[in-house]
Each structure stands twice: as C-alpha cells, then as structure tokens.
Amino acid sequence: MNKQEQERRAKLMRMQAERLPEIKRRFEENQNRSHFENTEEKPVETGAAVIFEQAQKRNFNSNFKPGGKDFRGKKSDRANGVNGANGTNNSDNQKSRNNRQNKNNKKRGNQGNAAENNPAVNDNDSRKVNLSVSTRRGEMVHHQRMLSQDVNAQATQHIIGVPVNKSRFNGYNGAQVTNAQLKAARPDPEAVRVIPIGGVGEFGIGKNMTVIEYKNEMIVIDMGVLFASEDYPGVNYMIPDIKYLEDNLSKVKAILFTHAHLDHIGACKHLLPKFGPLTPIYATDFTIGMIKRQMSEIDDLPELNYNVVDPFKHEKIQVSEHLSVEFVHMLHSIPGNCGLVIRTPNGVIYLSGDWRAEANPIDRQSDLERLDEIVKHEGISLMLNESTNIDSPGHHPHSEYDVGDNIGKVMDHYANGRVIISCFSSQINRIGMILEQAYRRGRKVAFAGFSMINNIEVALRAKCIKVPKDTVMKMEDIIKLPDDKVTIVCTGSQGELNAVLNRMVTGAHKFIKIKASDTIVFSSNPIPGNEPHVVNTVDGLLREGAQVIQNGKTHLTNIGPLHLSGHAYYEDHVDFVTRLQPLNYLPYHGEFFMMEHNAEMAENVVGISHDRILVADDGDIVELLPNKTIRKNGRISVGNKLYDDADKPVHEAVVKDRIHISREGIFMIVLTISKKTGRLIKTPDIVSRAFIYLDNSEELIGKIRHYLRVKTDKSISTEPEVKVLKEEVKEDITRILFDATGHTPIVIPVINKV
C-alpha cells in the first residue's frame, strides 16, 4: 500500500468517526418518530426527514442534506458497509453479494477468487475489485426501471391496444371497456360497420383511414401518413397497420380518397400495391394526379385501376351490390377536395372529409345545395364530421383573396428588394394568388423545392392553376435580374432543416443566399411541435439582416393575414351540422380532445341526442343498425408501421434502443483472447458513444481496465464460459458506470478469439 493510499484511508476513517455521533442521533430520532404516528399534530421539523426517509425507501439518489450533511452518507461510507442514514452495517448484504460471486465463479469453473489465482493482485487490488461491484444496486435497478418506463412511454405513444376512453360519449356509459368485453362482442349481421383504422383520437393529426363495411363488402377511405415527432429518433412518418384489410382483401370493393393532402394519401405507395389492379380507386383529377406522383417513387410501379370523378356531376357510383358513393365538392385549402355520401341499406352515411367555410373563396364554393337535396329526400343517418379546428371560436374570419391582397402589400412596401415567400407546397390556390400579385407589379417568379415544383406540375395538368404569361422563370435565370423584379416561392415554412428556406439561410442553396435587402414572408402557421424549428429559421434570417413577416403578427408590420386555416371554426361546425340534421353523429379526424369538444357541440348546441353521439378510437367498430341507431360493438386490431427518411421500415424495438442511447449512450468493451491459451492477450479496447468522453475519464477507465484484468485472469476456452463472462462483465460494468455517473448506458461486451 503506497503512502497516498494510506493517507486516503486514514482520512476516510477519521470522517467516519466524526460522523458516528450524528448518525447515532439520527437513528434515535427515527426510532422516536413512531410516537407521533397516531397523533393529529406532528413536529414540523420532522417533515423534511419523513420525506427523505420515504425517498430512501424508494432508492432515490437525492442530494438533500439535512443539517448541511449528506443524509445518505458518503459513497465511500456506503462502499465500506456503512449506511449513512442510520449507521447500520451492510455485512449481510456483503455476504449475499459474496455468495452470488461464488456461484458465478463455480459456473465458470473458478476454484476461488480471481485475486487468489493471480499473485499480481494484492489485497488492495481485491478491495478495488469489490468497489467495482456497485453497492447501490437498489438505486441502479430503480434508475433502470424508471428509464425503461420512460422509453416505453415515449416509443409507444402511437401504439394502439385498448385505449383509455371514459368519455361520456364512449358508448359504454362512461365505463372503460375491457378486453373480455371486446372478445365477447358479436356484430349484428345486418349492421353497417364504420371502423376508423387511423386518424381518430391519436397523438397528432394524420394517418387518416376509415372502412365502411356491410356483410362481405368493404369501402376503404383515405390512406394517410402521420409525421413523427422528435420523440421517435430516426423515424420520419408512420402509416396505419392494415392487417385487418389484408385478411379481408377479397371484400374490398373500392378505395376512395377525399383529397390530396399527405395525411390522406401519404401512405399510398406502401398500401395501394397490396390491393392489386382489380380494386377501383376513385378520386378527383388533381387527387389522382398527386397519388400517381406518390406512386412514381416506387421502383417497381404496379398497375392500378384509377377512376377520375367529377363531383359537380353528382354521379352515384355503385361500388358493390349494397353500397354506392357520391362525391360532393367541399371547400378546403387544396383543389379537388370532397365529402363522401355513402348510401347503405341502413341509410346515408356522410363523411365530411376536411372542409372550411369561406364567404369569398378562390375555389368553387362548397356544394351545400346538393347536400340540401340529399337531406330533404333521403336524410343523413350518420355523419362523420372532422374535428381539427373545433376549438377555434366564431366563424372563419377571412378569405384567400385577403391573403393575396396582403402579399401584394408586402411587394409594394418592400419594393426595392427580393420577396421570398414560403408556404405549403400543396397550397395551389395560394400560389396562384402569388403569381397574380407578382404579374401585376412586373415581378418574375421562380419556384424552389422538389415538392413545390412537382405539385404545381400536377395542378397545371389538372387545370387547377393559371400561370400569367411570361411570369415564371427558372431559378438560375431569375438571379440575373435586379432584386426588385424577383419573387421566389419556396418550401421550408415549418423550419425543416433541409428545406429550401433553411438552406438559403445557411448558404447551402445553389443559387440563393439571404441578404439584408430581402423580405421573407411566412405564408403559413407553424404546425404544433414545429414552433422551435420555425423560430430557429426566423432567427437565422434576422441575423442575416433580412426583414421577416409572419402570419399572426400583424401588430409588427400592419400586414396580415398571410395564411388561412383549411378547417372550419366552431360556429361553422354548428351551422353545418344543423343544416345536415344527422340522426347520429360521429366526430372523427382529430386528437381526442378535439373529438370530445366536437361531440359536446353536437349535443349542447345542435341538439343531437346524447345516445346518438359516439367518440371512437382507432379500431373501434361503430355499428349503424337497421333501426338507424348506432352503437359500439367490439374492436379490431390496429396499429402503426414506422418508416425512416429513406422510406424503409423501422421496428419499434429499434426506436426504443435509439431513445435509450440518446439518453444514456453506449459503452462497448472489446476483449481479445487467445484461442490457444484462452487468456487475454492485449489491453481491452473501450469505446464510448453518446456517454462519456474517454480522454476526460481516465480514472474511471483505469478502474474498468483493472476490473477486466482481474475478471479475465483464467483460461476461457469453451462457449459456455464465454457466455457467462459476457453476462457478468455486462452487469458489473453497468454497476461501475452507474456508481460513477448515475447513468446506465447500453453495455456491449465483445469477445474476440484470435
């Protein structure tokens, strides 16, 4: 034992001796606390101690220090068998650990402790090895359990089993339905079944997909994606799991699409090929064009049965023996948007799709007159009404023309520089207004962004947009013009890292670099969750000296609005549902709170009877019975498929590992053992990623290397011995790392035989 180590141990013993009176006093206080257990008044000064005692029982690693001293005792005290909380000895625990170690040694054929077999390991080394095996096992297990719970909760936000739904509109009088009840459910053979496969009551807006089923006939409506949040590292989007449909492919008689937003068509390239060329696909011209654009991304493009529908012809499409469909034009933020009138043996089902009310639209007004005729002559037995914007009070306040006029004001007010407008690439009518405003002022327009250019091409083919003569130029040509003649329309309004606008900010764009004379217009609102990314982009623009104008901040520039929501406001819903007078009401397309508020509106304002309103979840089976009442009756299995940026599937287990790594990191140990002798032939290699920086952790790494030398100080030749060694190293290193850092990275021991 060297001098430094002797001094350290002596200091440790002095500290323990100094603490003994304090430890004894606290132990007596703990013993006396029971006198107050059955009284109404407890001493105030014991409150902190009681809380800390509870934390101790749960193995919390608290830093609270009553009286200015560590209530748990120093790590060195605990390592030497002294519990700082009450002064008791941990000899029993030490015996238990020794017994476990002896058992492990016997498994490996070890006839004693590694230190005994290695003369180079003295008593001091043995003590170090014992320290390597954590005496904070309870804390570590608690940490791992809480981490596992957090990781599972984060990775399974969209995993759908039997969702908790105790809403008074849940169809079970507010009681939570059980698995046993669902298994016992038997459908009415004459019922029309409405089954949301995705997009209903989930965490986020998207993944819309609904099935209408009658006996052996099914209609599938929409196939959308839901873009993943940052809680899902490496996952770009998710789509519905359609196992139920794959098990019933012969029953699917038609696939219908309400419109071309990605939350309604984004899963087409993954799902449509499963149905083959015989299943007819119905949608408007623009929507079909956008679906074909999606399908063109597939290497082996399948043959599909596309059918273009003109909603203004009021055509009744007989898709099966008992089911027919009529597309009804509804105003939205994209051309070709429709609601669906589905005629069934049990009455008319109206599915609204996405819609908004607008007094003076660019697009044709919603075909409410046709819906009035249907209500008058047939009635609506069940209405599925979207819920997205139900929390916005009043009526939709503006028109797309207002947005166009305000974009013109920007061009007038900032006439001497370039105007760069960022919006959603699907905002075809908005883009048309920008072209018109630029044409009036003698400005030229260039488009930037892959999706932007593709969508405009589809719109031109479907005759959904008019381009003024000699207004559009290529990007490489427009940069040659004076700044006051340049308008650029680009993607990136959501602060996407690799979108055009961000690349302009960072100087990574091939043609455009932001400069102080530029004016950037955000003709959009941040999608919930994207706000930090938008702020980051705005900061970058302002740092370059550019003028930034955002929708919703009219008080800063006196220019606005610059964007419209594509969804109806609260009073618009009241008017619409009142107009259609549905017998039964099923909110859909929205998060749970949106659907709940939608249901409350239908009951409290419109006056629909409570027992005719249901709030469903993905997978719930809603039956429309022959007597035109509705009920929930069981569930089907639903879920999600996850995909990355390359459109490749990502397994849930991989997501969990990524989350764990992002929080705790990876620690890899590579042991190289001779095939002949079975002994370690080189210093173990240690690799740390997203955990600790090795150059700053020499003491910890030295301790781990010493542990590994002792642990491998015998011949390891058979595979069972290698397997046991891996497990022991993994467990012990995890404890060592937790003792030193409070974290439990994924420990990967690798044993190479050479």
Predicted regions: what is each one?
Residues 152-256, 261-480, 499-513, 532-536:
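His/Asp/Glu-rich metal-coordinating catalytic cores
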Residues 295, 602, 737:
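Conserved hydrophobic residues forming the short capping helix/wall of the S-adenosyl-L-methionine
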Residues 307-309, 383, 489, 615, ...:
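Extended hydrophobic secondary-structure segments that form protein cores and membrane-embedded regions
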Residues 329, 344, 490-492, 671-675, ...:
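Flexible glycine-/small-residue-rich
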Residues 392, 396-700, 705-719, 726-727, ...:
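Hard-cation-handling environments
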